[in-house]
Amino acid sequence: MYPWNDSRNYSTKKLDSIRKINTHFIVGVIGKMCLFEVPITILCLLISVYYGESALPFGVGTLAFLTIGVICQLLGKNRTDIRIGRREGMLSVTITWLVLSLLGAIPFLLKTGIAGNFFSALFETISGYTTTGATAYADIESLGKGLMLWRALLQWQGGIGIVVFTVALIPIFSGGASHIFNAETTGITHDRFLPKISDVAKRLTQVYILETALFALLLWLGPMGLFDSICHACTSISTGGYSNYTSGVSYFNSPYTEYVLTIAMYTGSLNMTLIYFAILGKPLKLIMDEEFRWFTGFIVLTTLVTAIWLWHIGAYSTIEETFRKSVFQCVSLGSSTGLLTADITAWQPFFWFIALLLMFINGCTGSTAGGLKMARFIVLVKNLANEFKKQIRPHMLTPVLINGKQLSISIVHQILAFCVLYVFLIISGAILITLDGNNFDSSVSIAVSCVSNSGPGIGKYVSNVAEAGDFTKAVLSFLMLAGRLEVFTVISILTPYFWRR
């Protein structure tokens, strides 16, 4: 009898081929991160009570995080298997984001007066954690101060996600920190400027907090109140894009506010490690970085083209306003923040192509930005240039260099595979969204927006996805999560190969 005809033999071999996952580690990670959310939900609860809002949403939310956190901590405490590999890193990051999103949706579900459902609440929470910034609610002001702060803090945590993970987990699971770091950090390599990941995480956390405090202060010096300043500082430095108002930043009608937020979004899209060195008095490390120079040049170029176009179509009456709207929107889209000061659908189709290009690339590696990242774009351009050279001189050795260092063939191939998967995910998502009755323009733009964690789409989803069906919101939620975790992390888990020895 052939083995593939013996169901018992096949089942046994299949069972043996399944790798035993260190579930204690994963459960422990979930518990630790749930407990990390408790003081944050308590803060939102206090804000709700202070402004005379119902305490129920965050009261239940706090209890849910606390209960799940304690249970998972107890289940993950007595671990006998200390083996921690890449699979555990990928699973812990993905499952933790899912659990946090489900529990984080509770305050939205329990908020009285909100016309919504489970998928709207889940979409809003995932959009927050992934720093996408697309919202499922058409009337933001009706959410109340407590949920406004919750939305801002969701994005602030999501922006510094890996740092939050490592700082929280190092005391208990130091052995698995590097795998979590690799599972969630963005970029083509994972270089560290300190030998211990715990030290890296702490330094980057300090930089992140300093940046947030600085921009909150600068915003407060303008027309914003203290509450709005804190919220918008959190959502801009994290390149998240949530605003406390349905009309977005245009609510404040303040050029000063727009310029400050432009700088904040641009800062958030830069490599945090290089910013750390700049703070230490080594700005040349930032200035001489090839990715930084490409990204800055890209933003300058798109800003100039956009400004010329807006002036050509007569969108604004003064040069200053034309420049301000152009630089704000290009930085916002190019950093994957997604804050809006204007209806970009009124800027005509030519700008829509610029917007899609900005959303597609997005920010630098090691930043809070989503998207493809400029470093990968550089590799694509240089690899394409090398292929043209080989057409003329087939035997010519043409390595791909970044900052003067040669990238290995394996890394170049990995980047090419990532880009193919990235585009495939966008196309697949757009096709699924059209099945729910959405038109082509809206489907493609919102798919690009969610995979790149950029926020606004083009067409009917430029400001919110409140009118989207449950199926569309579910698809978009998956796209946001996959995009935030660098595509490979989530997609790999869905393959049979991931579970084999």
Regions from the PLM with identified roles:
Residues 1-501:
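Membrane-proximal intracellular helices of multi-pass ion channels
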